[in-house]
Amino acid sequence: MNLDALMAIFTGFDVAAFLPELDTLIGWVEMVLRILVMAGPLLMLGFGLLYLLAPPKEANYSVGWRFWWSMASLDAWQFTHRWTGYVWSGLGLLLTLIMAFVCNAFRRMDPMQMVWAAVKSLGWELGLMGIACIAINVAVIIVFDKDGYRRKDYAEYEEE
């Protein structure tokens, strides 16, 4: 990988553009839009890391990924939280990086362009989060039956 090509990516990236001018109304609008756009990916990244590093120990009705198949057995519960951690932390990191570039571009936009860019970003975040949640549920349904037992094709240990 060429270092010049990598540096060209960050040519228009201005760290100072992350600080809105709070002495104007547009500056406050810009700050609120940045918080709205960055909150989803950062929460997804945080919960993904939480599910990877410190998942709930057993199935319960208060904390964790509550889904019929995931709560059927301890194995299904652990599988679900491990994969939720992988998917959410990866998607959260990717969206955090992308939305940082979107938020950086807010300074150069007109107010209505800024609002519509934030609305489009929130739509993409919501859509990708929904797809990720559905994919996790489908993966659990494929690997486990409704009683929480691994299907034959996905057994971890073969009995000899």
Give the positions of each predicted feature.
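Long, highly hydrophobic alpha-helical transmembrane signal-anchor segments
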Residues: 2-39, 111-126
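Hydrophobic alpha-helical transmembrane segments
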Residues: 27-42, 61-76, 117
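Hydrophobic core of alpha-helical transmembrane segments in multi-pass integral membrane proteins
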Residues: 38-49, 95-100, 125-139
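Membrane-water interface of transmembrane alpha-helices
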Residues: 45-64, 137-146
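Short membrane-interface loop/juxtamembrane segments of multi-pass integral membrane proteins
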Residues: 66-83, 156-160
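Short, intrinsically disordered, charge-rich cytosolic tails of integral membrane proteins
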Residues: 146-160
